Amino acid sequence: MSNIHEHKILILDFGSQYTQLIARRIREIGVYCELWAWDVSEAQIREFNPQGIILAGGPESVTAENSPRAPEYVFNAGVPVLGICYGMQTMSEQLGGKVIQGVGEGEFGYAQVEMLLESALFKGIEDAISPAGRPLLDVWMSHGDKVSAIPEGFKAVAKTDTCPFAAMANEEKRFYGVQFHPEVTHTRQGLRMLEHFAVAICGCGTNWKPSSIIEDAIERIKAQVGDDEVILGLSGGVDSSVVAMLLHRAIGKKLTCVFVDNGLLRLNEAEQVLEMFGDHFGLNIVHVDAENRFLDAMAGVADPEAKRKIIGRVFVEIFDEESKKCANAKWLAQGTIYPDVIESAGSATGKAHVIKSHHNVGGLPDDMEMGLVEPLRELFKDEVRKIGLELGLPYNMLYRHPFPGPGLGVRVLGEVKKEYCDLLRRADAIFIEELHKADLYNKVSQAFTVFLPVRSVGVMGDGRKYDWVVSLRAVETIDFMTAHWAHLPYDFLGRVSNRIINEVDGISRVVYDISGKPPATIEWE
């Protein structure tokens, strides 16, 4: 079995919104990497023993007092270094170059850089040719400051009209700096540049791929738990489903999955989870039908935060009860993924991401005397999905839209009642079914229906009815931090509205939410 961690890249984070994207791109190439705070010690870097180091971007100005700097050891470790945006600027400044503050000359968005010299980083890469016969590259810029003088031993490799050092290189030391962002898709051949760095320049093998990650995870699970039994809270979501499949492959019947049906799931979701994991894959599943228990606990409660806390508390109570029945279980499995492990603004300076100990299951009892098994701890969400496909999980389950942890508990506004949940489930299923039929489901980032606790008058035949209102919500987003409402076709919305009003007895009106984020959030509660 190939060692998936044998070759690795270390990414030092200075606070850029794009830093996780760099890590995902390096992983995509097939190379393992980790994302650390910029203020790490020499001892930590030595212990990690990377084949190369990337200095990522950041919002600070290198010219400001006390702005972040790369550890000096980075430039003495004898490995290639790539500085991106702020990373290039701090590299330049620390090695004897100069950086000046941008005064109205920053570059933001699309830019074309002109190559001045050949470099190992850009070998064979060009998007166009200049009138002077030089290669041009389409890139994405996002900087105010710029390098005004490069350090000794470096050469200018690329420029723009306003940035004389858009890229620089010291080929002998294998130090490279780019003022643009190769990790974003707008930099047309950015992935090739990162591949040149990680594979050709750093000499990394490309062992980081789904099949190898699965093999490695299974071996590690076996080594960790031995012959012990393991318990897992299976929700039917992506992370817990992939953990279940990995553990099943590793330890078979020694895994017990606890599936708690809280009555707040999507239409037929409980049946689908039980059929797929129990009947089809043969996992050992304990099914707890707790709908009444959850609804009783939320009776009379309208505040969204209070509802979330109740749902979390009742889940923990039930999971604790069920885990005590599995007296031989020595390990608790969780679907913690790599972004859970990266926490903002907690380094020594408060200006970078740091690694933290993270427990993914909301508030599990502190007195649970079990070891923790987290087989997805090193993986990004897109990697988890690819592994799920490799393990045989269906595409439409792995790539469906996000669903909140409290489920319909935060999509029924105000007090949650069984009647409201049943109406919402059916209306939402129609909306999602029609999105699939119209080939629109994968064109929006998230779509769902919200139950509004208001009655509206409607006309059915010769009679009038006074029934409930639902709102359809669909958004387009890259990172879920900001979002635009999706401009779905009017005839499509009309079709969905007609079906819901005609097929779901109890709903008299359908509205469409046209709020962006900000100012609105994606979920209503």
Curated annotation (Swiss-Prot):
Residues 208-400 form the GMPS ATP-PPase domain. PANTHER family: GMP SYNTHASE [GLUTAMINE-HYDROLYZING] (PTHR11922:SF2), GMP SYNTHASE-RELATED (PTHR11922). The active site is at 85 (nucleophile), 181, 183. The gene is guaA. The keyword 4Fe-4S does not apply. The keyword Nucleotide-binding applies. It catalyses: XMP + L-glutamine + ATP + H2O = GMP + L-glutamate + AMP + diphosphate + 2 H(+). Pfam families: GATase, GMP_synt_C, NAD_synthase. HAMAP family: GMP_synthase. Its EC number is 6.3.5.2. GO terms for molecular function: ATP binding; GMP synthase activity. This is GMP synthase [glutamine-hydrolyzing]. One of its GO terms (cellular component) is cytosol. Transmembrane segments: none annotated. Catalyzes the synthesis of GMP from XMP. Keywords: ATP-binding, Glutamine amidotransferase, GMP biosynthesis, Ligase, Nucleotide-binding, Purine biosynthesis. ATP binds at residues 235-241. Pathway: Purine metabolism; GMP biosynthesis; GMP from XMP (L-Gln route): step 1/1. Residues 8-207 form the Glutamine amidotransferase type-1 domain. Homodimer.
